[in-house]
């Protein structure tokens, strides 16, 4: 059973409810950005918690690179959120992988904690009023040619952009932990 604090936090982020705003520095060193600026003049936004060293995140580099072309009416915020993943590691990944999407750095995982993120990648769809419409995986970690492939986030985006309610508003996550876990034997 979750602690009462965990239950309080979970209840503060219901689907359809408001998500907390944030302001983080981009890895590039430019001016701070937050949810409000990502949503500016957009119908909504996708926020993806991401890690430079997570192999699951690496798989979605191309998806994130093409996102703005595929969904020009939506903002995109990619948040580097992994314990002890410093700006140097993020900058190296950007250069080595020729990443063109901006990455915001959640240095102390404050935004990840506020948004209940414990693994990367984790995607959120938010409308222009900062209401949470979808949270979960980008897909079911199968490749598009697999008959069982399910592009969860794309389906949510299609529903939202066509003016329909998002049919599947939450999916289970998978990926790399944002924080180290140590097991101690006594």
Language-model features and meaning:
Residues 18, 43, 118-120:
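Short, small/polar residue-rich loop motifs at catalytic or cofactor-binding pockets
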Residues 58-97, 107-114:
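Structural microenvironment flanking redox-active thiols in thiol-disulfide oxidoreductases
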Residues 17, 30-31, 110, 131, ...:
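Residue-level signal for well-ordered, solvent-exposed loop/turn and beta-edge residues enriched
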Residues 93-127, 132-133:
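Short, internal strand/loop/helix patches
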Residues 35-59, 64, 157:
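Short active-site neighborhood of thiol/selenol oxidoreductases, capturing the structured segment around
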Residues 51-61, 83-84, 123, 174-183:
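Short, thiol/selenol-centered motifs that function as redox-active sites or metal-ligating centers
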Residues 2-37:
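N-terminal "domain-start" segment that seeds a small globular fold
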Residues 127-128, 132-186:
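Thiol-/selenol-based redox modules, centered on thioredoxin-like
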């Amino acid at each position: 059973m979750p602690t009462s604090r965990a239950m309080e936090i979970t209840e503060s982020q219901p689907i359809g409810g408001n998500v907390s705003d944030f302001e983080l520095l981009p890895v590039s060193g430019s001016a701070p950005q937050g949810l409000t600026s990502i949503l500016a003049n957009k119908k909504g936004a996708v926020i993806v918690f991401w890690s430079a060293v997570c192999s699951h995140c690496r798989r979605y580099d191309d998806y994130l690179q093409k996102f703005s072309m595929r969904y020009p009416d939506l903002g995109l915020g990619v948040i580097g959120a992994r314990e002890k993943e410093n700006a140097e590691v993020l900058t190296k990944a950007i250069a080595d992988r020729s990443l063109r999407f901006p990455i915001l750095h959640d240095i102390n995982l404050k935004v990840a904690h506020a948004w209940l993120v414990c693994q990367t990648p984790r995607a959120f769809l938010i409308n222009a009023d900062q209401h949470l419409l979808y949270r979960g995986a980008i897909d079911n970690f199968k490749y598009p040619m697999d008959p069982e492939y399910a592009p969860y986030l794309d389906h949510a985006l299609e529903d939202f952009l066509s003016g329909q309610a998002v049919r599947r508003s939450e999916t289970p996550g998978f990926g790399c932990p944002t924080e180290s876990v140590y097991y101690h034997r006594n």
